Every structure is written in structure tokens, then in C-alpha cells.
Amino acid sequence: MDMLQDLESLQFEYGVPEEDRIWLYLQGRSRGLMIEACAHATFFCKLLYNLRASLNKNQSSRHLSIGSLNSATPEEFKVGIIGGGHLGKQLAGTLLQLGPIPAESLRISTRRPETLGELQKLGIKCFYHNADLVSWADVIFLCCLPSQLPNICVEIYTSLEKASIVYSFVAAIPLPRLKLLLNHTNILRPQYQYDEDSVSVWGANKGVIAALQDPTILQATCPYSPAGGIILNIKWLEGVFYAALNICTARNMAHSQVLQLLSELFLSVHFEDCGKDTASCPKLQLTDFVSKAYGKNLSQERPFPWFDLTAVQLKETPFSQHLSSSPVLQDHLTHLYCASFGISLTKEQPVISTGFPSQ
């Protein structure tokens, strides 16, 4: 309960002149963008954590096994954050509290590590050495200013492994430029669109972690939801799938096993309309990700090819067509997203899955 909620003189808007109040919507937009960014990054890490855990079980047992996903050693999935500003701190806190990442598997490189005392008390290692962070981490989040990014890329590009995933929040630097700066293709960059006529649902008096535990706010962050006026470009979701394929390819896993594994992991949350017969639910097929001509010549034992994630997010892919033409697949992914944060959708909470741009 917020004891200051009804005290008008203590509200942010109180000191804003009447003629400037038309700009107050930007405050809600900024807050909503922060919440969405942290939510989508956390969802991504949850998926990758579960995927790597399942791959570890598969390699140790020499057969496909996806039970008890969280039994793998959590230290095997390492996350690094470059930038200790507001976004970097909020992201670290969200991953630690709502994600599967323990403190010892999360590190931050920032020019002023002494300002991150609260995070260090939680066990997160904070220091200033970008190259060391990149050589250690499996996923690297770029939470820096656009002006800082070129120098950071010079520092880190030689430390990137082929399988390292770079996740950039630096909206001002387009993907082709970032690919060139890093000499790297395994890059994800979410893009957001704004609806100026929307009503803010972002809960002005809640922190990011508390906001993502509110069912209304969490559902507003769903990839296909326009609620709150911030819409995620669905090319990001395609990039997430192809990033998962690259992880499996790095393990030299047969594509037939990969499809079975990803179907189990990504399409495992069913909704009421599925009923007891889940056999009719979507399953991932080879031609969902590669052309029919390529798939025809790919033997069952061969892994998927290595995908350029920057190209996936900039061009049409087989999965673009499959995803846009399958509302059932969209609904399954929406339910998976909400379930990953502990929220179950009901008939009173409809899935919104059509009519949004995917450019």
C-alpha cells in the first residue's frame, strides 16, 4: 500500500506547469519501455537456461531427455551486463529475482562499479573490464549509451566466441552497424513501436520487479499485446528461435532431435481450447526454419546450419511466414510467456495474437 498515493503535492506531476503536461505521457512510455525490456530479456534467459539444461542432460545420457529441466548446474549458463546505469541495474535485479540466474552466474562491467553496492551485496560481481566479461559470459547484454558503444565494441570483439549471444538495448545503433562493429552475427536487438493514443497500464508506483508480478502489467508485455501502447517487433521472437537453433548447432545436435526438443520446450504450455488431446497442438517442422529445397537435402543426422541472427531480424524467413500464418502457434507462445512468469491465462483473459506489424 502506497501511503503517499493521495498526497497531490508529493506527486511528480504537481510541479509541472499546465502547458507542459501534454508531455507527461513520455514518463509512462519510458517506464513501460523499461518494464518491457526487462521482461523480454528475462523471458529470453529463462528459455536459454532451460534449453541448455536440457542439452546438458541429453549429452550426459546420450539420448533425448527433457525432464527436470532445472536440475542442471545453473553456473553453466552465465550472463554478463555491460553498463551499470539505470537499465543495467534494473535488468540485473529482474534477472536475479524473477529469472533462473543465481548471483554467481551474473556479472556487470561498468566504469563505476563502486556505485553498484546494493547489487554487490546480493552477490553479483561488479567490475570494469569489458573484454573479461565477454570472454566469460554466454549472453552479453549491452546497456550502454550509444556514444560509448563504438569504443566498447573495439574492446570486446576479439573476446567474442562464435556462440556468444550479444543482446543489444542500444536502439540508436542499427543491427547492420552493430554487426560490422563487432564482426559478429549472433546478435539480438528488440525494437519497440509506440501508440500515442494508448492508456498507460504500467503502475507508476511499482518497481519493475513488482510490476512484472502484476498480471495486468505482465500481459501488457506479451509479444503480441498492444496494451500499454508499446508493441514489440515480432522479428525479435523469430530471432529467439533461431538463437536456440544456433545453440543446438554448436553442440552438433541432429536437427531431428532439435525439432523435438524445441517443440517440447517452447510449445509445452497448453490452454483450455487444447483440451485433453494435445496431439493437434503445433509441432515444429524442418521447413518452419529452412527452405524446402535446403530441407530436402538435409539428412536426419545433420545439424541445422548456422544462422545469421542479424539477417533473421532484417529479412523474411521461413519462420516469419509460419509464425504469421498460425494463430494457434502465437497463442501457445503467449501462454508460454505468461506461464514463465507464473501467470496462467484464462478465458476471461483472452489472447491477442493478430493484427500487429512484424516488420
Curated annotation (Swiss-Prot):
Q: Which Pfam families match?
A: F420_oxidored
Write out the GO MF terms: pyrroline-5-carboxylate reductase activity
First-level EC class: oxidoreductase
Q: Does the keyword Isomerase apply?
A: no
Q: Which InterPro entries match?
A: NAD(P)-bd_dom_sf, P5C_Rdtase_cat_N
Does the record carry Oxidoreductase as a key word?
Answer: yes
Q: What is its EC number?
A: 1.-.-.-
Keywords from the named record: Oxidoreductase
GO terms for biological process, alphabetical: L-proline biosynthetic process
The function of this protein is:
Probable oxidoreductase.
Q: Which family does it belong to?
A: Belongs to the pyrroline-5-carboxylate reductase family.
Q: What is this protein called?
A: NADP-dependent oxidoreductase domain-containing protein 1
Report the source organism.
Homo sapiens (Human)
Q: What is the lineage of its organism?
A: Eukaryota, Metazoa, Chordata, Craniata, Vertebrata
Whichever gene encodes this chain, its name is NOXRED1
